[in-house]
Amino acid sequence: MRGVVGVLALQGDFREHKEALKRLGIEAKEVRKVKDLEGLKALIVPGGESTTIGKLAREYGLEEAVRRRVEEGTLALFGTCAGAIWLAREILGYPEQPRLGVLDAAVERNAFGRQVESFEEDLEVEGLGPFHGVFIRAPVFRRLGEGVEVLARLGDLPVLVRQGKVLASSFHPELTEDPRLHRYFLELAGV
């Protein structure tokens, strides 16, 4: 094993991210408490229900601990779907929803519709090429700060963005067999 990556395991599809990391030869550590962050250089925040993830992270003290590590530059983050919502500075229409706020972006929850309107679409990811995106009640990035780079779009809408060591995706790369986006994050994190 080359390294260990944390996967926030409070709610959502954290098991799928663990499997994606395993296929790359990376050990995944479930993170549920602040002490679970010790020694980690990278953390994946999975899809699921963004309000629940935010409330539980706040209740368990993870919100402040993760924010501090990201601001210090000692922790890289990858948020997918609900995880991307939690990373954003602003959640449109939900000003009171708990959020980490480390990604200078405003996101719109469920921007493509409800669960029954979920879909799959081929995307062009900068530096990676074609990538199959699975969109389930997916958010979209409506406003991006100057330091945020768009890596993929669906039409005109940004669906994969990066700011420093923070990567955020509207779609679910863990639900495909394609390891490239997880590998990209590992390289970004130096794992």
Swiss-Prot record:
Any one Gene Ontology BP term: pyridoxal phosphate biosynthetic process
Family listed: Belongs to the glutaminase PdxT/SNO family.
Biological source species: Thermus thermophilus (strain ATCC BAA-163 / DSM 7039 / HB27)
Cellular component GO terms held in the UniProt record: cytosol; glutaminase complex
Gene: pdxT
EC number: 4.3.3.6, 3.5.1.2
Reaction catalysis annotation: aldehydo-D-ribose 5-phosphate + D-glyceraldehyde 3-phosphate + L-glutamine = pyridoxal 5'-phosphate + L-glutamate + phosphate + 3 H2O + H(+); L-glutamine + H2O = L-glutamate + NH4(+)
Keyword presence, Hydrolase: yes
GO MF annotation list: glutaminase activity; pyridoxal 5'-phosphate synthase (glutamine hydrolysing) activity
Coiled coil: none
Protein name: Pyridoxal 5'-phosphate synthase subunit PdxT
Key words of the record: Glutamine amidotransferase, Hydrolase, Lyase, Pyridoxal phosphate
Binding-site list for L-glutamine: G48, E49, S50, R109, I136, R137
HAMAP family in the cross-refs: PdxT
